[in-house]
Amino acid sequence: MSSCISPESSIISRFTRSHGIDGNVTSILSSSFACRSRSTTNCGLVTTELNCPHSFTSRNNVVKMHDKVISPPALVRTRTSSSVLANASSDSNVDLFMMSIVSSYVCYITVLLRMYTRHKTSFPL
């Protein structure tokens, strides 16, 4: 048996569900960001392959569909056979969180070392 769901169609439907859009994402991306698209129907499911000349990471990019607004975290990257729609904001939040932990740890170690060098005789180790 052949599978009716292709990776592109599941990517598009995840993007659509996450932004609460009932319509076709392709027309929005095509008109606003010069993305070329190719749609095929497989087992009654529309598979859309997006081909975009650039990635969208800017917070200023806003895509409108009817009364709904999509603004990044939508990230579209061009691949040879398919495009990936990913959430860019979650990666950057994790990076910021890790940076804050590392910087706090470095600060804590620095303070301990300064205390130790000032009070070598009275500092219990």
UniProtKB/Swiss-Prot annotation:
Q: Which UniProt keywords apply?
A: Membrane, Transmembrane, Transmembrane helix
Additional comment: Partially overlaps ERV46.
* Segments crossing the lipid bilayer: 96-113
Protein name as catalogued: Putative uncharacterized protein YAL042C-A
Any one cellular-component term (Gene Ontology): membrane
Its membrane topology is listed as: Single-pass membrane protein
The answer to keyword Membrane applying to this record is yes
Its localization reads:
Membrane
